[in-house]
Amino acid sequence: PIPVWHDDTNSFSLNTINMPMEKTALWIPKAWTGTGEKDEAKSQLVIPAKRPDLAFLGAEGTVLNAAPQNPGPGNTPIWAGLGAGEIGDTDKFEGETYTLDLISVDGPGRMEMFIDNGDSVNRFLSSHDTAYRSVYNPRHTHLYTTFTQPGRYVANYKMTARSADGTAIYSSPITPLVWQ
């Protein structure tokens, strides 16, 4: 999701790169590193041993469908994190802050968005853990997006901010983003 602020209507919308988010479907194809020595599926994440910080994803050895945090050469299979957006001056918002909320996810399993630092994890958004449903002042961020089951997921997002004088609440419509 990429937040966009519209000064003319005092409202938000959500995009993916240069398209309205509701007109976008993100596809995770079967993709491989193609190194020849050790081909790895870039469209999967296997939960490694001795990483208790990844326990929220499942047990060690669990295989998840994934859009990688850093897809690498050829941009395979897909990278989709958070965009910096077109917000402009944030002084129009109370505390100069605005929020991206994950309202709901409809799909056959769980969806998680996080940063893997190698020895620790920063969780961002989760379909099932309500403690991870909001990101304050979202910025350009590279995230893993994982899915416990293959299939179609519809993630519904909303942007919200309060006016600097506290008299108005600005928000986007609830906007779907499809993953498959």
Named regions from a protein language model:
Residues 141, 149-153:
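Short tyrosine-centred short linear motifs in exposed loops/low-complexity segments
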Residues 157-159:
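Hydrophobic/tyrosine-rich beta-strand signature of extracellular beta-sandwich/beta-rich modules
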Residues 155, 177-180:
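Long, charge-rich, low-complexity alpha-helical segments
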Residues 1-139, 170-173, 180:
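Phosphate/adenylate-binding glycine loop and adjacent helical scaffold
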